Amino acid sequence: MRHYEIVFIVHPDQSEQVPAMIERYKGMVLAAEGKIHRLEDWGRRQLAYPIQKLHKAHYVLMNVECQAETLAEIEHAFKFNDAVLRHLTIKMDRAISDASPMMKDEKAKNLLDAQPAAEVEASA
């Protein structure tokens, strides 16, 4: 089986359906005896350029290990799902399970935001 990194962008009006989409695509991989090494929901983010007159979209990252047939099935599902604005699949040499730079940045921001609040409470 090969390793793939998949990023897909979902229409912002469909953000509440993202967990169901993730479960569906996860189920496709697991049903074909594949593995999911990393799954990250990056949330709603600004797009670099407008897509269908939209400036924000919901991002999801998956690192999977599966057969080419399973990947073709997932990409086919992306094409026929109107909520998926764009998708990108990259073949990887090995499984990647570390946090992505996007998530590392989020953790750093959260830590920086939480620290001043704690300092304010301590000084009060």
Curated annotation (Swiss-Prot):
GO molecular function annotations of the record: small ribosomal subunit rRNA binding; structural constituent of ribosome
Keyword terms of this UniProt record: Ribonucleoprotein, Ribosomal protein, RNA-binding, rRNA-binding
InterPro entries: Ribosomal_bS6 (IPR000529), Ribosomal_bS6_sf (IPR035980), Ribosomal_S6_plastid/chlpt (IPR020814), Transl_elong_EF1B/ribsomal_bS6 (IPR014717)
SUPFAM superfamilies per record: Ribosomal protein S6
Superkingdom classification of source: Bacteria
GO biological process per UniProt: translation
One Pfam family here: Ribosomal_S6
GO cellular component: cytosolic small ribosomal subunit
Residues passing through the membrane, by range: none
The keyword Hydrolase is annotated on this UniProt entry: no
PANTHER family linked: MITOCHONDRIAL 28S RIBOSOMAL PROTEIN S6 (PTHR21011), SMALL RIBOSOMAL SUBUNIT PROTEIN BS6M (PTHR21011:SF1)
Function, as annotated: Binds together with bS18 to 16S ribosomal RNA.
Similarity annotation: Belongs to the bacterial ribosomal protein bS6 family.
Protein name (Swiss-Prot/TrEMBL): Small ribosomal subunit protein bS6
Naturally occurring in which organism (per UniProt): Chromobacterium violaceum (strain ATCC 12472 / DSM 30191 / JCM 1249 / CCUG 213 / NBRC 12614 / NCIMB 9131 / NCTC 9757 / MK)
